[in-house]
């Protein structure tokens, strides 16, 4: 009896000391056996391969070997042509998200998954990823600015159609073009303001580091030194050692 008690107690102690790592259980209806799934950390350049596996019965599993100090911004890539040696001829699907030290579920129809490459229609909404609180926060941000983002895209496409494309043939619809640009700038300002407010409220999250880097890159020289300093000094000390913080600082220094 004492031996049994010791074995059970030892097992419980070992379980308690197991590192908390990410685990992704994936379901890709329509995927063929042999498709390769890879998970990359894209916090910084170059990307770092975290894990890889092969799809079997439309399912896959990825699991970490050590605990993330901070949630990682990742890209999950599905290689539908693993035997193709020419990278230019490969068919790749990809999805970017934040991974926590948690059990996550990834679901998407294979033919509806976003492409690794640019495509005119954003398909990220076809993916369901649950179990990552950090990704939930990022999704909450995207939902909060969805209307502004869609309006910004629509205005840019209208500008290309009304002014840019005709200008290539020597037709300059200047008045119409300037009207669109003024409205586009107003929408961009509102979007930047909403992003800035989100960063202030969530200044302890790596999500805000990603958004800050995007904000700095999109505004370029439009931000004043005081605004940049205010942005950089607004993060909690807990984020100072995050790899994404290094990228944000480099971007700010180039402004």
Model-derived segments and spans:
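N-proximal helix/coil linker or "cap" segments that precede and/or mark the start of modular domains
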Residues: 227-255
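Sec-dependent N-terminal signal peptides
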Residues: 3-12
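A non-transmembrane, solvent-exposed segment enriched in polar/low-complexity residues
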Residues: 16-183
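Helix-turn-helix repeat elements of alpha-solenoid scaffolds
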Residues: 183-192, 222-229
């Amino acid at each position: 009896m004492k031996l049994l008690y010791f074995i059970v107690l030892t097992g419980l102690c070992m379980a308690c000391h197991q590192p908390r790592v990410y685990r992704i259980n994936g379901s890709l209806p329509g995927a063929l056996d042999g498709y390769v799934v890879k998970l990359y950390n894209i916090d910084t350049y170059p990307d770092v391969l975290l894990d890889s596996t092969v799809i079997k019965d439309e399912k896959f599993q990825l699991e970490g070997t050590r605990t993330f100090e901070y949630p990682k911004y990742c890209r999950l890539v599905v290689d539908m042509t693993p035997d193709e040696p020419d990278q230019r001829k490969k068919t790749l699907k990809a999805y970017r998200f934040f991974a926590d030290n948690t059990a996550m579920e990834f679901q998407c129809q294979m033919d509806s998954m976003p492409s690794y490459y640019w495509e005119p229609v954003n398909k990220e909404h076809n993916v369901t990823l649950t179990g990552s609180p950090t990704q939930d926060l990022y999704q909450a941000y995207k939902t909060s600015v969805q209307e502004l983002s869609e309006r910004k895209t629509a205005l840019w496409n209208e500008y290309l159609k009304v002014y840019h494309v005709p200008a290539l043939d020597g037709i300059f619809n200047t008045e119409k073009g300037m009207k669109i640009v003024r409205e586009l700038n107003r929408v961009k300002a509102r979007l930047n303001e909403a992003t800035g407010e989100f960063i202030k409220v969530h200044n302890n999250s790596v999500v805000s580091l990603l958004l800050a880097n995007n904000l700095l890159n999109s505004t370029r020289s439009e931000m004043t030194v005081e605004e940049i300093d205010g942005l950089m000094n607004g993060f909690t000390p807990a984020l100072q050692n995050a790899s994404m913080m290094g990228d944000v600082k480099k971007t700010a220094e180039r402004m």
